[in-house]
Amino acid sequence: MKNTKKVIYAVLFSMCLLFAVNKVNAQPISPHFFGQNAWMPDTIGNASACTEPPCILYGKLHHEWANVKNSGASIIRFGGIAVDKNIPTNYQYIRMIDSIRANGMEPVIQVPFRNYRYNEQQAADIVKFINITSGKNIKYWIIGNEPDLGYSYNQASQIAAYIKPFASAMKNVDPSILIIGPECAWFNQGIITDLTTPNGPYDITGKDGNGHYYIDVISFHTYPFNGSQTRAQVISKLTSSGSLQDNLVYLNSRVSSCNTSHGRNGSSALKTAITEANIDWQNNAADNLYGVGASSFIGGQFWAEMMGISMKNGVDFINFWSVAEGSNSVSNIGYVDASTNTKKPSYYHFQLMAENFKGNYVNGTTNQLNVKSFGSQNSQETAVLVLNEDLTSNYNCTIRLNNTAIAGNSQLKINMNANIAAEFNEVIQSQSTVLFIFNSSGALIKKYEYSLNQNAVANIGPTYTQYGGTTGIEPIKSPAHEGTYFEIAKVFPNPNTGKFTVQLNKENTDELKYVLEVFNIEGQLVYEKNDAPFVKGKQDIDLTFESIASGVYIVRVRLGENIKTTKIVVVK
């Protein structure tokens, strides 16, 4: 019987590969693709009568909402093992929902199960209180957490046995909700296969007796490593056999079969989500920017690659774990450092993509194993992300925006399936990520450079350059009243002798006070002005009286939570 199943899986996998090839080229990116997990809050459950301690977690999530909002996250999951162990109070549910929505994001709410500690009536009561009594109209709901780990369930029958009654009870209260499951701790193929066998004994994708679909989104978690990974493993993992790329291709074949068999289409079509994800669930004790864990630069690039593969395969949303947690380097796996509030490379990679990837996914191919590339495209722009994960190699690169072979001797050749007959040449530094934005004709209009040695070590975000026409960097006109949002339009002259002007893309009509800083290439602060007025959007800087040497410097401008950076070259 086991051999028969293996043959069936092999045939299905071959079929889904064909399905994927036909699907990739025009794969829309979900409008709520970029997600996070609401972890770690201060308290979950009744602290005075905690069922399974601890209920008091001492988390500082309430201080991080501005960071989460500014990262570009759009969908936030309130769930995980803590929510499953100790049912949140009504106040905690509502406070979390209101905090998420106050920052322009949409909540995903988990009801607890904890191996029958909680029942379907309690789940229905939670839906009733939140959606009916409180009028919060939460769309996405999750049942339980990691049944194959937390409950040690190893059979689909065990999971279907609680998913179905919970889903029916919840949808009887509010038929408009969408339910997510089974929330496997990893891509547990055997369990997921049985749960997605149309009309099989454990199928959770069909309808109950009241005509309600049980599950609307098939979900799983992924933490590929445990902290012992090598750099080579990190670079090759996601597209290796049996890893994320293969798993999503296989899952798409299951979902397609369920949609066909159950007549699910349009808004009722079954979808997929990854509701917890990170490079590892714990770091090596020595992990830092130069390591290979959640605090490392390549860890941020790993996040970007996970998002690219997920977009390519039509994942509706991916929620990374987590915002901020951990009191030591092993448990510090959030995208904001819980101790220092420093934004990690994972934060900036997430933000780069969340702010710039729109429309359809665009596939990319490269001729270097240590370089990955992919992008997005809408009617106005094509975004191309290049991840150079090589430790030492700087590459002369040619990017072509279609699949025509690239001539010449460039060390790095990248073809993007964007159907634009245009090429662009650039030097891609080692251990760096570069995002290029082209207009509909294939002309470069924006560039974001984020590298280990120039940005991450200085704890600054990507260096931004905006292009206009053929004469270099030009300012872009924008409304005067845009709150704290701004861009650095240009720095001139550049190169310079230490005297230069920073020009923003808008006039400072509200007389806001900006912070302007200049760092050397080693990340040391060499100049700071805390109340830069930017009269008419311009600020003159004179470093000729400072003891600075010729070289490359980073200019950073801050206003509230908005931070923009760019490079200058000083020649004395």
Where in this protein do the model-derived segments appear?
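Beta-strand-rich binding/interaction modules
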Residues: 392-418, 512-518
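Noncatalytic carbohydrate-binding groove/subsite architecture in carbohydrate-active enzymes
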Residues: 123, 156-298, 313
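N-terminal catalytic cores of secreted or lumenal carbohydrate-active enzymes
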Residues: 27-216
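Aromatic/acidic polysaccharide-binding cleft in carbohydrate-active enzymes
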Residues: 274, 279-353, 357, 361-371
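C-terminal beta-strand-rich structural cap/linker in extracellular carbohydrate-active enzymes
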Residues: 423-471, 551
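Carbohydrate-binding surface patches
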Residues: 367-406, 431
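C-terminal outer-membrane/trafficking sorting elements
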Residues: 477-492, 496-572
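Bacterial N-terminal signal peptides
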Residues: 10-20
